[in-house]
């Protein structure tokens, strides 16, 4: 009897050791505004293939889809979410009080017909971030979703939070900022703060905007988290393979001009997309970042499903690799 017990325990220990050695799978979700609906379609196929995700990294809309997935929302939940939202209401929260005057200055920001056009040095005041939209509606929406996430519901005790990172860009220091699961709603909101579109997000001394400014397909981030196999969903349609910084002589001007000249986002993107093990690039050439109308959302979800289905064998291969070790 003691021998049988010993053998059983030895088998369990060996099984746990093998489990720990199984390759970790990372999911990368790129930015692209409304085109993020296609990522939901791809998630349907990833789940259908039985692939378990160990790490997630996302940028902009990919940060939102990935962040929500990390706290237990699944493809069916996100599908319903994308189809049922009144996106115009959700995104349209511009502060119209500034429209009362043609030109108005407040807290170091100059407004023209209600739109922020220039920042002056704020003295003794906290300057407001640029952006046509405050983004409060989006933040409140995300905060509610996170607070009521499936992983926090008692009946879903089997769900575990998936380690998650999202990318933002600090416009003051002109560098990448990697945000974690802490303050998830705020971090997702920062990652999708399109410059000039949404008000930037201030964290400590940083002024954060859309991570697409520096890393729109963060394959390197999910690798750094520990992923050995990476599935990347890329919403970008124009690849810029031959980008060679033609205005490099202007980089000495610094700031945004330096960014515009060097386009570090393109360089990083070209490096990252080649490093994905399973690369999924839905054909979204007929859609744009603002294609939030219900018909377009429905179409893009289906396009995402088809793109994922086209990679079904590769996705099954990922599952088999995980099971083989």
Label the model's feature ranges:
Residues 1-7:
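Bacterial N-terminal signal peptides that target proteins for export
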Residues 19-59, 67-325:
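Patatin-like phospholipase
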Residues 10-19:
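Hydrophobic h-region of N-terminal signal peptides that target proteins for export
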């Amino acid at each position: 009897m003691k021998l049988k017990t010993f053998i059983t325990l030895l088998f369990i220990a060996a099984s746990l050791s093998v489990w720990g050695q199984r390759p970790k799978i990372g999911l990368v979700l790129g930015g692209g505004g409304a085109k993020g609906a296609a990522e939901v379609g791809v998630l349907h196929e990833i789940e259908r293939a039985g692939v378990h995700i160990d790490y997630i990294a996302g940028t902009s809309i990919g940060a939102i889809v990935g962040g929500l997935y990390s706290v237990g929302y699944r493809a069916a939940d996100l599908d319903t979410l994308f189809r049922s939202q009144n996106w115009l209401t959700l995104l349209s929260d511009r502060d119209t009080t500034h429209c009362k005057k043609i030109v108005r200055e407040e807290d170091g920001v100059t407004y023209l017909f209600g739109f922020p056009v220039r920042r002056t040095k704020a003295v003794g005041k906290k300057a407001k971030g640029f952006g046509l939209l405050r983004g409060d509606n989006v933040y409140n929406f995300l905060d509610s979703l996170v607070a009521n996430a499936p992983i926090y519901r008692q009946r879903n005790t089997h769900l575990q939070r998936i380690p998650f990172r999202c990318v933002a860009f600090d416009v003051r220091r002109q560098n990448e900022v990697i945000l974690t699961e802490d303050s998830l709603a705020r971090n997702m909101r920062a990652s999708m703060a399109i410059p000039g579109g949404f008000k930037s997000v201030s964290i400590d001394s940083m002024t954060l905007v859309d991570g697409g400014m520096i890393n729109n397909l963060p394959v390197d981030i999910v690798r750094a988290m520990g992923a050995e196999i990476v599935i990347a969903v890329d919403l970008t349609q124009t690849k810029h393979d031959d980008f060679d910084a033609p205005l490099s002589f202007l980089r000495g001007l610094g700031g945004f001009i330096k960014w515009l000249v060097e386009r570090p986002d393109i360089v990083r993107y070209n490096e990252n997309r080649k490093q994905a093990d399973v690369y999924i690039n839905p054909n979204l050439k007929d859609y744009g970042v603002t294609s939030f109308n219900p018909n377009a959302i429905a179409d893009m979800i289906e396009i995402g499903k088809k793109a994922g289905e086209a990679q079904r064998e590769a996705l099954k291969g990922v599952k088999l690799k995980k099971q083989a070790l």
